[in-house]
């Protein structure tokens, strides 16, 4: 006989996602699908979506950590767009990367030009005498 009868063959291994294989939280399969559907290239290698998902995950974690620090500095427990704006604009590299990006409800960085500040005069010393 061929040996393919009712003998209990090896059970199929549990499916493991490419994200878990790579140790990522971001979806490698979805990134791969979007790369294929986006007409960026005729073919997409197997490593490209893994690398791209890892880069996206790293950038997201970096921004969220800085935004969480900004929220904590403002004594808040929830990150709002203002905290994202402060985090990105105060970080030199992220500001360069996202320089042309507008964040809705983000506001602006607090900045007063030095010439507009009141001058420190000698009158304070004269009053104390």
From Swiss-Prot:
Residue positions, PTM N6-acetyllysine: 6
Similarity annotation: Belongs to the histone H2A family.
N5-methylglutamine found at: 105
Positions carrying N6-crotonyllysine: 37, 119-120, 125
Modified residues (Phosphothreonine): 121
Official protein name in the record: Histone H2A type 2-C
Keyword Acyltransferase: no
GO MF, one annotated term: DNA binding
């Amino acid at each position: 006989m061929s040996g393919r009868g009712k003998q209990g063959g090896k059970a199929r291994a549990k499916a493991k996602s490419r994200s878990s294989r790579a140790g990522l939280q971001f979806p490698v399969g979805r990134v791969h699908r979007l790369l294929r559907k986006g007409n960026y290239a005729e073919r997409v290698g197997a490593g490209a979506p893994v690398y791209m998902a890892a880069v996206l995950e790293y950038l997201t974690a970096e921004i969220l950590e800085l935004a969480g620090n900004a929220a904590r500095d403002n004594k808040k427990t929830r990150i709002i767009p203002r905290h994202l704006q402060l985090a990105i604009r105060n970080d030199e590299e992220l500001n360069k990367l996202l320089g042309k990006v507008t964040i809705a409800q983000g506001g602006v960085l607090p900045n007063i030009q030095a010439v507009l500040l009141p001058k420190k005069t000698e009158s304070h010393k004269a009053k104390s005498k």
